[in-house]
Amino acid sequence: MIFAKRIFVSVCILFAGSVFAAAQTGSGSTEGIFSIKSSPAYAEILLRKTELQADIDAFGSDYTEASTKMIELRAELASLDRSLTKVLAVRPSETGKLTQGLGKLIVRKAALDADLDRSLRRYSKEHPETRRAQRRVDRFEAAIAEILK
């Protein structure tokens, strides 16, 4: 009985070691996800996304879903989610591009997207304020695209 337990424990240790070694060598497509999720850009985006989700939870009891505050928070969160999808699509060989600066650009662009959304709800597309907001968003999109190309 003791001999069987020792064999079982040895097999479990060997199995755990092989799983750990496979994770360390990065076999399969999980390597890319691990390196992307440990990048400074991902951390920056995740930090802002978490802050927004916490704000939505905190304001949920005080504001309705149709309130301006909730609409703006959700617009910024949606922009971050779209950007996060793009970041997760980066090839593992290009994770060096995922710097903190890129993360800050993406977070700032999400805030500008929310401003543009607010402007579009108030004014027409041709209004000077809306055009200004659109140009800001376009500048940040161009900077992000330049880094990721």
At which residue positions do the language-model features occur?
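Bacterial N-terminal signal peptides that target proteins for export
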Residues: 1-9
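Outer membrane pore-forming secretion/assembly proteins and partners of Gram-negative envelopes
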Residues: 2, 72, 79, 92, ...
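Bacterial N-terminal signal peptides
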Residues: 9-18
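Boundary at the C-terminal end of the N-terminal hydrophobic targeting segment
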Residues: 21-23
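Immediate post-signal-peptide N-terminus of mature secreted/exported proteins
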Residues: 25-65
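Long, charged amphipathic alpha-helices with heptad-repeat/coiled-coil character
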Residues: 31-36, 60-70, 82, 86-131, ...
